[in-house]
From Swiss-Prot:
GO cellular component term, pick one: ribosome
Disulfide bonds: none
One Pfam family matching this protein: Ribosomal_S6
Species whose genome carries this gene: Borrelia turicatae (strain 91E135)
Swiss-Prot/TrEMBL GO biological process terms: translation
Gene name of the record: rpsF
Protein name per the record: Small ribosomal subunit protein bS6
SUPFAM superfamilies assigned: Ribosomal protein S6 (SSF54995)
Length: 133
Protein backbone atom coordinates (compact mmCIF):
# COMPACT_ATOMS: atom_id res chain seq x y z
CA UNK A 1 0.00 0.00 0.00
CA UNK A 2 1.44 3.36 -1.01
CA UNK A 3 1.53 5.90 1.80
CA UNK A 4 2.81 9.42 2.14
CA UNK A 5 5.77 9.78 4.51
CA UNK A 6 7.63 12.66 6.07
CA UNK A 7 11.25 12.03 7.07
CA UNK A 8 13.52 14.22 9.14
CA UNK A 9 17.25 13.68 8.71
CA UNK A 10 20.13 15.01 10.80
CA UNK A 11 23.46 15.16 8.99
CA UNK A 12 26.96 16.17 10.00
CA UNK A 13 27.42 19.91 9.64
CA UNK A 14 30.42 19.88 7.26
CA UNK A 15 29.30 20.97 3.78
CA UNK A 16 30.91 18.16 1.75
CA UNK A 17 29.83 15.40 4.12
CA UNK A 18 26.31 16.84 4.27
CA UNK A 19 25.87 16.99 0.49
CA UNK A 20 27.30 13.50 -0.03
CA UNK A 21 25.06 11.98 2.64
CA UNK A 22 21.99 13.82 1.31
CA UNK A 23 22.64 12.46 -2.18
CA UNK A 24 23.04 8.97 -0.71
CA UNK A 25 19.68 9.30 1.08
CA UNK A 26 17.98 10.43 -2.15
CA UNK A 27 19.60 7.53 -3.99
CA UNK A 28 18.28 5.04 -1.41
CA UNK A 29 14.80 6.55 -1.67
CA UNK A 30 14.78 6.09 -5.45
CA UNK A 31 16.09 2.52 -5.08
CA UNK A 32 13.05 1.71 -2.96
CA UNK A 33 10.68 3.34 -5.49
CA UNK A 34 9.86 6.48 -3.54
CA UNK A 35 8.20 9.23 -5.57
CA UNK A 36 6.86 12.81 -5.27
CA UNK A 37 9.81 14.26 -3.37
CA UNK A 38 9.42 17.57 -1.53
CA UNK A 39 12.55 18.82 0.24
CA UNK A 40 12.84 21.42 2.96
CA UNK A 41 16.18 22.35 4.49
CA UNK A 42 16.04 23.63 8.06
CA UNK A 43 19.70 24.57 8.05
CA UNK A 44 22.50 24.09 10.53
CA UNK A 45 21.74 24.14 14.25
CA UNK A 46 23.50 23.47 17.52
CA UNK A 47 22.63 20.14 19.13
CA UNK A 48 21.51 19.88 22.76
CA UNK A 49 23.97 17.07 23.38
CA UNK A 50 26.78 15.56 21.28
CA UNK A 51 25.76 12.89 18.78
CA UNK A 52 28.73 10.86 17.54
CA UNK A 53 31.01 13.63 18.86
CA UNK A 54 29.20 16.25 16.76
CA UNK A 55 27.98 19.47 18.41
CA UNK A 56 26.23 20.87 15.31
CA UNK A 57 24.11 19.29 12.62
CA UNK A 58 22.11 20.05 9.48
CA UNK A 59 18.43 19.19 9.35
CA UNK A 60 16.59 18.18 6.19
CA UNK A 61 12.93 17.23 5.85
CA UNK A 62 11.85 15.18 2.86
CA UNK A 63 8.26 14.23 2.05
CA UNK A 64 7.72 11.30 -0.30
CA UNK A 65 5.33 8.53 -1.31
CA UNK A 66 6.42 4.92 -1.04
CA UNK A 67 5.09 1.41 -0.67
CA UNK A 68 4.86 0.55 3.02
CA UNK A 69 6.42 -2.88 2.44
CA UNK A 70 9.75 -1.23 1.57
CA UNK A 71 9.96 0.87 4.71
CA UNK A 72 11.87 -1.62 6.90
CA UNK A 73 14.46 -2.24 4.19
CA UNK A 74 14.87 1.51 3.65
CA UNK A 75 15.49 2.06 7.37
CA UNK A 76 18.17 -0.65 7.37
CA UNK A 77 19.94 1.03 4.45
CA UNK A 78 19.70 4.48 6.06
CA UNK A 79 21.47 3.19 9.18
CA UNK A 80 24.46 2.31 7.00
CA UNK A 81 25.01 5.90 5.81
CA UNK A 82 28.04 7.13 7.73
CA UNK A 83 27.36 10.90 7.84
CA UNK A 84 23.69 10.55 8.73
CA UNK A 85 23.51 11.11 12.49
CA UNK A 86 19.79 10.51 13.06
CA UNK A 87 16.63 9.95 11.05
CA UNK A 88 12.93 9.67 11.76
CA UNK A 89 10.26 8.60 9.27
CA UNK A 90 6.60 9.32 10.00
CA UNK A 91 3.40 8.55 8.13
CA UNK A 92 1.99 11.88 7.02
CA UNK A 93 -1.71 12.24 7.75
CA UNK A 94 -3.53 15.09 6.03
CA UNK A 95 -6.56 15.61 8.24
CA UNK A 96 -7.98 19.02 8.89
CA UNK A 97 -8.27 19.59 12.58
CA UNK A 98 -10.99 21.88 13.81
CA UNK A 99 -9.78 24.16 16.52
CA UNK A 100 -12.41 25.25 18.97
CA UNK A 101 -11.69 28.50 20.74
CA UNK A 102 -12.04 28.28 24.47
CA UNK A 103 -12.81 31.36 26.48
CA UNK A 104 -9.82 32.07 28.63
CA UNK A 105 -10.74 32.40 32.27
CA UNK A 106 -8.91 34.41 34.82
CA UNK A 107 -7.39 32.61 37.79
CA UNK A 108 -9.19 35.00 40.13
CA UNK A 109 -12.55 33.77 38.80
CA UNK A 110 -11.77 30.27 40.01
CA UNK A 111 -10.59 31.53 43.38
CA UNK A 112 -13.62 33.80 43.83
CA UNK A 113 -16.02 31.02 42.86
CA UNK A 114 -14.44 28.70 45.38
CA UNK A 115 -14.68 31.33 48.11
CA UNK A 116 -18.34 31.97 47.31
CA UNK A 117 -19.15 28.26 47.35
CA UNK A 118 -17.40 27.84 50.70
CA UNK A 119 -19.36 30.78 52.16
CA UNK A 120 -22.64 29.39 50.83
CA UNK A 121 -21.96 25.95 52.24
CA UNK A 122 -20.95 27.36 55.65
CA UNK A 123 -24.10 29.55 55.71
CA UNK A 124 -26.20 26.56 54.79
CA UNK A 125 -24.69 24.48 57.59
CA UNK A 126 -25.14 27.24 60.19
CA UNK A 127 -28.84 27.76 59.35
CA UNK A 128 -29.77 24.15 59.90
CA UNK A 129 -31.51 23.52 63.22
CA UNK A 130 -30.94 20.14 64.68
CA UNK A 131 -33.11 18.84 67.51
CA UNK A 132 -31.49 16.49 69.89
CA UNK A 133 -33.70 14.49 72.28
Amino acid sequence: MIKKYEACFLFKSEELEYKAALEEVKKQLTVFNASDFAENSLGERALEYPIRKQLRGRYEIIEFKMDSENLKELEIQLKLIKNLLRHMILVKINKKVSVKKVKRRNFREFKDNRDIKEKESSEFNSNVDVKVD
